[in-house]
Amino acid sequence: HTAHFGAGTLDSSKMTFAADRLFSALAIEAKKMGKMEEFVSIAGQDEFVLTDAFPYQSGPFLPKPIGFPKFDQADLTTDVKEVRRQAKMAKKLQFIPLEKFDSYVNGTLFEDAEHGVTNIVTKNQPHVDGALYQVSTVRYRDDSSLYVIANESELLNELMASLQYTGIGGKRSSGYGQFDLTILDLPDSFNNRLTKVHQGPVMTLTTSLPVEK
């Protein structure tokens, strides 16, 4: 599958998308179905959950946590060049397999997995002479996909089923953003790590900012 998730311009595209993009797309589907009121009601409930999209390749990947691993503590046994190499490797890394997440936080580094290939496509604006423009797209590997976490809801399932044909992201009129929907239960190893109450560092899976109550 191929998609365009804009990063500010047509000639740039991200590998994944944030929850607000999906929420907007679901709202449009709900309006088309005449179920906007029901969707708004569900979205306003405390148990409503909708995360950003992340890669799935033989298992779920997580976003790289900010501030980890820590390279600011001097280790006299490590060469300065090696420290710089590790810092560069960590900077390039975008997503971490769930099973390697703890190891990464504790300082173990590894190469970033390839989930898709970014291409630049040149298109012509109809009925306008010489109006060429470029669109950046991401084509996902056959063994890669994207996943989101959401609370169980018949309406959400119905909206997502419809959205797979409408598509998500930019340039949908060109056929981008369509997908094959699969609904799965969260693995216990993942579900057990999700929490709303925790004394210690946590990482949000939805692009958001904290507020004081």
Go through each PLM region and give its residues:
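Conserved active-site/ligand-binding neighborhood in enzyme cores
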Residues: H1-K213
